[in-house]
């Protein structure tokens, strides 16, 4: 059996990681993809073993210390799951390196959840002793991210988000038929 290693997104096996998910692999033919707004994706890998993974979380934590069915939405849980899965697949903690993406502020007037998410990810990784070798967080654009865990390559594309209110025009109603004199319409 021949194994091929390439960074060609058209030939790679794509795994889309959605909100609340994580995925880990050592397969050199896999590219992980996600789309982020204020959410964060951490791409963590062991460059020596070739094991890597991506998560995608919505909020840094629940704020109330609960561990319930919604835990997958939160950064602390997502980071723990990703790191533990990497270690189970043969990665070594002392060799892990991270790249983080997302954390945009997409809507004016709302709290900056994206900045909180990015700050959480940076703090968590620092506290765990995992260096961040690259990051692209903040700003006002959503991101499309592709991550090749075996090589560590990441491709990011900014996605335009137009928050300007659209000029909505209501269709002109058709004219009402003329009522013949003496006729009465009852509703």
UniProtKB/Swiss-Prot annotation:
A single MF term (Gene Ontology): protein-glutamine glutaminase activity
Transmembrane segments: none
EC number(s) per entry: 3.5.1.44
Recorded catalytic activity of this chain's protein: L-glutaminyl-[protein] + H2O = L-glutamyl-[protein] + NH4(+)
Keyword Signal on entry: no
InterPro entries assigned to the protein according to its UniProt record, in alphabetical order: CheD-like_sf (IPR038592), Chemorcpt_Glu_NH3ase_CheD (IPR005659), Cytotoxic_necrot_fac-like_cat (IPR011324)
Enzyme class: hydrolase
HAMAP family xrefs: CheD (MF_01440)
Family: Belongs to the CheD family.
Biological role: Probably deamidates glutamine residues to glutamate on methyl-accepting chemotaxis receptors (MCPs), playing an important role in chemotaxis.
Protein name per Swiss-Prot or TrEMBL: Probable chemoreceptor glutamine deamidase CheD
Organism: Caulobacter vibrioides (strain NA1000 / CB15N)
